[in-house]
């Protein structure tokens, strides 16, 4: 069989690889003399050497070969790099293709441009060392490892002509998130979705240790990958000429396999889960770099991971670096002006076929707004506040069902969750779409479909990664999850929020659909599952992020939940967190009042207030269960103190509590004072940890009078009301808090305290005997 590459093409591709490697080394080391036109001097070298060489030559090799495939077959392909510390490689490739100069005209394709390219890398106010948002063609920074394959599959969903080449580092492959991501092939429909080509880059070492997959033997590794449902092809070697031919032939064969799988599914229907191809590329870490430094082996070892030659106080190191860089023969690669030679330029694709200029890697360029039904049509009808009970998320489920239905043709909306869609009472969506499933099916299964648009897998990492990949390539989605277990992806949220923050500063990065979380089965109604399921702290985590990114909503009822969700699905470039219960709760606002309330973010509930502008106390609340307890406390206060003047303030958008100087949603001081006064006690019943309210309001005039009750890390398997009692968020405690802080009621404090303890004692005795809450709690309802 003839070699897939002619000798001429092999020589040119090898030269292109050398050029990319040369530019990569130059970025790590040089601040001047980019073409080595004069002997290398110490002042040409950066004072601080930062970056990672070890993975870069392998990444560059793959890029060159994928370019051949793209150009030969006119492919639509993007490149995701799991080991994103190989940032110099993708920067070099986008520079060689010209897309870098298109985005950053000052980095022209010339000697001066190359010098600026080198100097800016890992330089103050330059560019980061990883495949960051500043890098054309990137949707995955790869700083925190483990998410590349999930992002790749998310990008491929509903993109039938897209191939996502995903480089999985063998160190990255040891992470839990990546381990679960291999199973994504059970959720990829070849008739409707694109293809993912996983390439396991087996260079053998991490920072200072061998990698597990490099040390288990080829047979065991093959069995492992086949067990995940892939057909691995191995490309191994350290002789570039041999590896070039092997890799080219393997890619040709794999492309044919991908096309066969897709053609069969698209022409004859999906009859079985295909075994998708993948590549295992085993090449030396730090390939083409120095073999030894100070008589210690470097190439092919962990010493090649970062900066192989670091100490230039030793004169021989300067020569070693110069010899290394000259080994790429830059004079053969670039003309006298520093531009890549034309015969090499011709190897790369052009226009949007360049992976560094593919619009899927700048998803905002492709983003189309969702077709959204009128959420007013799903409203709970209320004759009066507190007259009707409803399950808020079940109401929302009907709206999401029709969001799904309205966008079936455009195929740009999916719902994600870890086996909780039905549990979270969103099952109305199954009237329109099943759950995507390409694995085996048994007769007891329900709502499974090869064409499903509900993505359920019991891995929060995978749900988050899929959704991020889906959003980053220009689509929309929502992630529904138990509140306590969303913490599993705390760090993934961090990375996405950082990505959005940086993208907002890059003019050519177009806004993408917001990352929308619906957190339900929340802390106050996890009484049946116990302490492990009780944690409202994700909103604290989110609130730490930039104000132009983070949004947190605590709708008190179903109509507010509808209004907030519609708003979030229309938004761009945010992380929206919505916390809402799924259990039957009293409903407070009709749909028009809900819209006004959510638009304002916070407001006085006139139906529950009688302060006439001069309250004795402000009873504030945020969250559905705290709202019930606050209103129940208001009723008790009026019973105990008939002439008391109470103002009820409900907060649905937590960020309004911050000053406007801190958050764009923040109320100005006058607006805040109109709600909370400047001198009256505020008893704040809060869904989460009390410290969050203090953090948000510490600059406000009346902060010293704000007394917050919320979750204080007390819980067990108990009754719903006992949960609030355990955390001092119950109506009896809130009532006592108010009386203790109203100066004119000082004479009632002793009696009020005794009454409180009597109520708590009755509660404890009753639940201990009956296993349920007191009738006065279970049967409570609001009356004006």
Swiss-Prot record:
<dbReference type="GO" id="GO:0016832">
    <property type="term" value="F:aldehyde-lyase activity"/>
</dbReference>
<dbReference type="InterPro" id="IPR009014">
    <property type="entry name" value="Transketo_C/PFOR_II"/>
</dbReference>
<dbReference type="Pfam" id="PF03894">
    <property type="entry name" value="XFP"/>
</dbReference>
<dbReference type="InterPro" id="IPR005593">
    <property type="entry name" value="Xul5P/Fru6P_PKetolase"/>
</dbReference>
<dbReference type="InterPro" id="IPR029061">
    <property type="entry name" value="THDP-binding"/>
</dbReference>
<dbReference type="Pfam" id="PF09363">
    <property type="entry name" value="XFP_C"/>
</dbReference>
<dbReference type="InterPro" id="IPR018969">
    <property type="entry name" value="Xul5P/Fru6P_PKetolase_C"/>
</dbReference>
<dbReference type="InterPro" id="IPR019789">
    <property type="entry name" value="Xul5P/Fru6P_PKetolase_ThDP_BS"/>
</dbReference>
<comment type="similarity">
    <text>Belongs to the XFP family.</text>
</comment>
<keyword id="KW-0786">Thiamine pyrophosphate</keyword>
<dbReference type="InterPro" id="IPR018970">
    <property type="entry name" value="Xul5P/Fru6P_PKetolase_N"/>
</dbReference>
<dbReference type="InterPro" id="IPR023962">
    <property type="entry name" value="Phosphoketolase"/>
</dbReference>
<dbReference type="GO" id="GO:0005975">
    <property type="term" value="P:carbohydrate metabolic process"/>
</dbReference>
<dbReference type="InterPro" id="IPR019790">
    <property type="entry name" value="Xul5P/Fru6P_PKetolase_CS"/>
</dbReference>
<dbReference type="Pfam" id="PF09364">
    <property type="entry name" value="XFP_N"/>
</dbReference>
<keyword id="KW-0456">Lyase</keyword>
<protein>
    <recommendedName>
        <fullName>Probable phosphoketolase</fullName>
        <ecNumber>4.1.2.-</ecNumber>
    </recommendedName>
</protein>
């Amino acid at each position: 069989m003839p070699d897939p590459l002619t000798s001429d093409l092999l020589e040119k591709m090898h030269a292109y690889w050398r050029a990319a490697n040369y530019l990569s080394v130059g970025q790590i080391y040089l601040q001047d003399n980019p073409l080595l036109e004069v002997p290398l001097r110490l002042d040409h070298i950066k004072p601080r050497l930062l970056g990672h060489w070890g993975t870069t030559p392998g990444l560059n090799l793959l890029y060159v070969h994928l370019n051949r495939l793209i150009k030969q077959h006119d492919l639509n392909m993007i490149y995701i790099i799991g080991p994103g510390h190989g940032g110099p490689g993708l920067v070099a490739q986008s520079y060689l293709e010209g897309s870098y100069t298109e985005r950053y005209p000052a980095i022209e394709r010339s000697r001066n441009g190359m010098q600026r390219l080198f100097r800016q890398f890992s330089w103050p106010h330059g560019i980061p060392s990883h495949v960051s948002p500043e890098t054309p063609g990137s949707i995955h920074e790869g700083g925190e490892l483990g998410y590349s394959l999930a992002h790749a599959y998310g990008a491929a969903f509903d993109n039938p002509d897209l191939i996502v080449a995903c480089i999985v580092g063998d160190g990255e492959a040891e992470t839990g998130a990546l381990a679960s991501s291999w199973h994504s092939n059970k959720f990829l429909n070849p008739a409707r979705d694109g293809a993912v080509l996983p390439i396991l880059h087996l260079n053998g070492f991490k920072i200072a240790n061998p990698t597990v997959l490099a040390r288990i033997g080829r047979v065991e590794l093959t069995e492992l990958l086949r067990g995940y449902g892939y057909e691995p092809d191995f490309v191994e070697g350290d002789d570039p000429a041999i590896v070039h031919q092997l890799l080219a032939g393997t890619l040709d064969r794999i492309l044919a396999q991908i096309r066969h799988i897709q053609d069969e599914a698209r022409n004859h229907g999906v009859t079985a889960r295909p075994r998708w191809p993948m590549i295992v590329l085993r090449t030396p870490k730090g390939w083409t770099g120095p073999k030894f430094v100070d008589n210690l082996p470097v190439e092919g070892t962990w010493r090649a991971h970062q900066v192989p030659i670091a100490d230039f106080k030793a004169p021989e190191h300067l020569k070693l670096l110069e010899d290394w860089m000259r080994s790429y023969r830059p004079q053969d690669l670039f003309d006298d002006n520093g531009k890549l030679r034309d015969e090499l330029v011709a190897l790369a694709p052009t226009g949007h076929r360049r992976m560094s200029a593919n619009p899927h890697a700048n998803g905002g360029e492709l983003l189309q707004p969702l077709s959204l039904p009128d959420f007013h049509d799903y409203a709970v009808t209320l004759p009066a506040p507190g007259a009707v009970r409803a399950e808020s998320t079940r109401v929302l489920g009907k709206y999401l069902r029709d969001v799904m239905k309205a966008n079936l043709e455009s195929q740009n909306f999916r719902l994600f969750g870890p086996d909780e869609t039905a549990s979270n009472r969103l099952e109305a969506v199954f009237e329109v779409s099943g759950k995507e499933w390409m694995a085996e099916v048994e007769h007891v299964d329900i709502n499974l479909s090869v064409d499903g648009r509900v993505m359920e897998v019991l891995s929060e990492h995978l749900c988050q990664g899929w959704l991020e990949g889906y959003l980053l390539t220009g689509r929309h989605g929502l992630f529904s999850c138990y509140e306590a277990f969303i913490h599993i992806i705390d760090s993934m949220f961090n990375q996405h929020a950082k990505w959005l923050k940086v993208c907002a500063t890059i003019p050519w990065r177009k806004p993408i659909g917001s990352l929308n979380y619906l957190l339900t089965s929340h802390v106050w109604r996890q009484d049946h599952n116990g302490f492990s399921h009780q944690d409202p702290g994700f909103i604290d985590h989110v609130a730490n992020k930039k104000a132009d990114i983070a949004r947190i909503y605590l709708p008190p009822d179903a109509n507010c939940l509808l209004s907030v969700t519609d708003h979030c699905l229309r938004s761009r470039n945010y992380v929206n967190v919505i916390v809402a219960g799924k259990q039957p709760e009293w409903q407070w606002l009709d749909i028009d009042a809900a819209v006004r309330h959510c638009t304002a973010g916070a407001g006085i509930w006139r139906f529950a207030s009688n302060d006439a502008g001069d309250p004795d106390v402000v009873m504030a609340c945020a969250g559905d269960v705290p709202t019930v307890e606050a209103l129940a406390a208001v009723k008790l206060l009026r019973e105990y103190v008939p002439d008391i003047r109470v103002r009820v303030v409900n907060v649905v958008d937590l960020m309004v509590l911050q000053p406007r100087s801190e958050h764009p949603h923040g109320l100005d001081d006058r607006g805040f004072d109109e709600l909370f006064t400047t001198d009256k006690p505020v008893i704040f019943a809060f869904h989460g940890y009390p410290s969050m309210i203090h953090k948000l309001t510490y600059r406000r005039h009346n902060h010293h009078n704000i007394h917050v009750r919320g979750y204080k890390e007390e819980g067990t398997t108990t009754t719903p009301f006992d949960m609030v009692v355990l955390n001092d968020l119950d109506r009896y405690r809130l009532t006592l808090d108010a009386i203790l802080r109203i100066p004119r009621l000082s004479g009632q404090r002793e009696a009020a305290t005794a009454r409180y303890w009597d109520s708590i004692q009755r509660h404890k005795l009753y639940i201990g005997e009956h296993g349920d809450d007191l009738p006065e709690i279970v049967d409570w309802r609001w009356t004006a």
